[in-house]
Amino acid sequence: MKRQLEAYCAHLRNERQVSEHTSQGYRRDLEKVIAYCEEHGIADWQALQIQQLRQLIARLHHHGQSPRSLARLLSAVRGLYRYLNREGLCQHDPANGLSAPKGERRLPKVLDTDRALQLLDGGVDDDFIARRDQAILELFYSSGLRLSELTNLDLDHLDLAAGLVQVLGKGGKARVLPVGRKAREALQAWYRLRGIGNPRDRAVFITRQGNRISPRAVRLRVKVAGERELGQHLHPHMLRHSFASHVLESSQDLRAVQEMLGHADISTTQIYTHLDFQHLAAVYDSAHPRAKRSKGTDS
């Protein structure tokens, strides 16, 4: 079972071109299934049945795994069995028809427009780290990139004259996104200093040593910026969420936002309509005269 898991993970990286983060997540989930199989004397993937997989899901849920994590595990199992069936190594899928326990879908955390501008409009020193970090923040918010999409950018993926960036998203799907004026200006300022790092490759964002910046380093730099400018915890995906929410709020074009985010299913994008409704409800409650409660009344 472990040998076939290794082959599947190699397939994900080399043929599906998923990120290392996604590949490792699938590996961890499938290792839980293997551990369960070893515990119950299940020798191979063909022998695993739906009843046993259902029992594993119930056990993990009982021990505190979230519905979202369990849904991801089932997705990993389905992907593995699609691969095994295609390779002629298996003839069924025990995850077929199984679903994770339902859970409350949490709305993504976003910055409102004023807070986003506060983050981006802080003073920037004209040095290597400051210019690089500013360009990273501006590009995240301007184009709604995933963390892996940003760190994988090469110089020839950006056309600043045209205001476009080409990214490789999940499943190796390419898309072209607009880059706003402020982000272009920040990138141009960064390019002027980038050569100081004696770059060893064509990565857009590099360290002082000339190496491509890592996802971990970007998360840290975004966190530092959030604490410095906003006094709050900030992570890269919050900037992507903020981009999506603000574009949808202004345009009301859900399909366009779906394409820009690279979502395969529009239901994933629809979560931002709930954020927009939250904002509208807050405005209504604070502004509409019939929404304000009289003091001392409960009804």
From Swiss-Prot:
The keyword DNA-binding applies. Residues 1-85 form the Core-binding (CB) domain. GO terms for molecular function: DNA binding; tyrosine-based site-specific recombinase activity. It is found in: Cytoplasm. Pfam families: Phage_int_SAM_1 (PF02899), Phage_integrase (PF00589). The active site is at residues 146, 170, 237, 240, 263, 272. One of its GO terms (biological process) is DNA transposition. SUPFAM superfamilies: DNA breaking-rejoining enzymes, lambda integrase-like, N-terminal domain. InterPro entries: CB, DNA_brk_join_enz, Integrase-like_cat_sf, Integrase_catalytic, Integrase_recombinase_N, Integrase_SAM-like_N, Recomb_XerC, Tyrosine_recombinase_XerC/XerD. Forms a cyclic heterotetrameric complex composed of two molecules of XerC and two molecules of XerD. NCBIfam families: PRK00283.1, recomb_XerC. HAMAP family: Recomb_XerC_XerD (MF_01808). Site-specific tyrosine recombinase, which acts by catalyzing the cutting and rejoining of the recombining DNA molecules. The XerC-XerD complex is essential to convert dimers of the bacterial chromosome into monomers to permit their segregation at cell division. It also contributes to the segregational stability of plasmids. This is Tyrosine recombinase XerC. It comes from Pseudomonas putida (strain ATCC 47054 / DSM 6125 / CFBP 8728 / NCIMB 11950 / KT2440). The gene is xerC.
